[in-house]
A protein has these predicted regions:
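HTH-adjacent hinge/linker in prokaryotic transcriptional regulators
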Residues: 2-5, 9, 15-23, 28, ...
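Conserved phosphate- and dinucleotide-binding cores of soluble alpha/beta proteins
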Residues: 11-12, 22, 45, 51, ...
Length: 249
């Protein structure tokens, strides 16, 4: 077994068990004690697990309950967001009925969309304005306006989503976790994300690597409930997942 394959297997075992001993890994991977210890040292140095006496434990997830405002988020990881946004926009085909979630990466998508035969629904005023400026047909959800993320949220928005059946949808997330799925800091926004996902055939979450192994206050979908579009991913446990697309260009 190649080194990278062992790394991925070790991290996968840790994700499911939370902790593992050297002896268990020797059995699971059919590898020597020296090989396992060397692998654990390397993964610990990379910050992918925490090495303890006799084995390893899952590296503590980063928890976040704070929502940064849109202005501060727009310039974070902008190159990565542009790559992700361009690839995501290319998934939209003529005739698609698309849900576009509020967020800085979903907003960047709009500049790359070429199919004017697609119809859009969004909970972001800025997205609706830009889509209309570019000549797209767009519907804006009604409800409570959340100033921090500039999103329409709450029960009225959820009720408005009941009548829609989307072919494709694109969402942002504050946290992406194998165990806790996709999460966001605020309940009212999570409600809208959850309902729109439930009414969508193909779901895509747009997330740069900084969102991985992060957990926010409210989970709105399980990890397997969407395809993740990212770029520059270095985490083996996610790289081997069939629902993760790592954009190369």
């Amino acid at each position: 077994m190649l080194t990278e394959e062992r790394f991925a297997k070790i991290l996968s075992i840790l994700e499911s068990m939370g902790s593992v001993t050297v002896q268990q890994l020797m059995t699971e991977l059919n590898a020597s004690e020296s090989t396992i210890r060397r692998d654990l040292n390397a993964l610990d140095a990379n910050g992918q697990l925490t090495k303890v006496h006799g084995g390893a434990i899952l590296k503590t997830m980063a928890y976040s309950t704070k929502d940064d405002n849109v202005v501060s988020r727009k310039e974070k990881n902008r190159d990565a967001k542009n790559k992700i946004a361009k690839y995501a926009a290319e998934q939209i085909a003529p005739g698609d009925f698309v849900y576009l979630d509020a967020g800085t990466t979903t907003e960047l998508m709009i500049e790359y969309i070429t199919s004017h035969q697609a119809v859009f629904v969004t909970n972001a005023i800025s997205h609706a304005k830009r889509l209309a400026e570019r000549g797209f047909t767009v519907y804006l959800l009604g409800g409570e306006f959340k100033a921090v993320t500039e999103a329409i949220v709450g029960e009225e928005a959820v009720a408005a989503l009941e009548k829609y059946n989307f072919t494709k949808g694109f969402w942002g997330a504050n946290g992406v976790s194998l165990q806790k799925g996709y999460s966001t800091p605020e309940l009212k926004e999570a409600m809208v994300k959850k309902k729109s996902m439930e009414n969508c055939k193909e779901c895509f979450v747009l997330a740069d690597e900084s969102k991985f192994n992060q957990i926010s206050s409210v989970t709105f979908a399980p990890f397997e409930g969407a395809t993740v579009i990212t770029t520059g991913l270095s985490l083996p446990a996610y790289k081997k997942c069939n629902n993760v697309i790592d954009v190369k260009q």
